[in-house]
Amino acid sequence: RAILAQLGPDGRLLALDRDPEAIAAGMQLQAADHRFSIRQSGFSRLHEVLAEHGCLGRVHGILLDIGVSSPQLDDPARGFSFRADGPLDMRMDPGSGQSAADWINAAGEKEIATVLWRYGEERASRRIAQAICTARSTEPVVRTGQLAGIIAGVVRGEPGRHAATRSFQAIRIYIN
């Protein structure tokens, strides 16, 4: 809305998002302001979407908001956060790709450790991966609280930071 407020009458704002809930909210704005369009798409398809809108070569700016949103973190049913127990999903678009639970329960210990290190800079990545594999050998890891508990059993959080922060970040990035 703030960007739209700064656009002139001939300006256009095109938004891309993979989250169906964000698309639904954006459709309301699209209906209210002809200068705004929203598409359910990943940023990897930006060139294609710009071509579809006749905008190639006519773009004056691009703003990428590539993080997880507060509504995603605040809704336990989305499975993004360790703050409240929910299904272990973490997908921006719950209708596509592999859920975090599916990946956690299928990936090898080395792959899990690599993801935790590469995307979360988790120093205890190997110990966490080993604990996840041990835990899932008796019961599949399917809940955010379950995964957070496994991680907290291996590492202590830093002051002001939950033990699972880095690992959850890494898994969210990898899944999406």
Briefly describe each language-model feature range.
Residues 1-176:
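S-adenosyl-L-methionine-dependent methyltransferase catalytic core, i.e., the SAM/SAH-binding region
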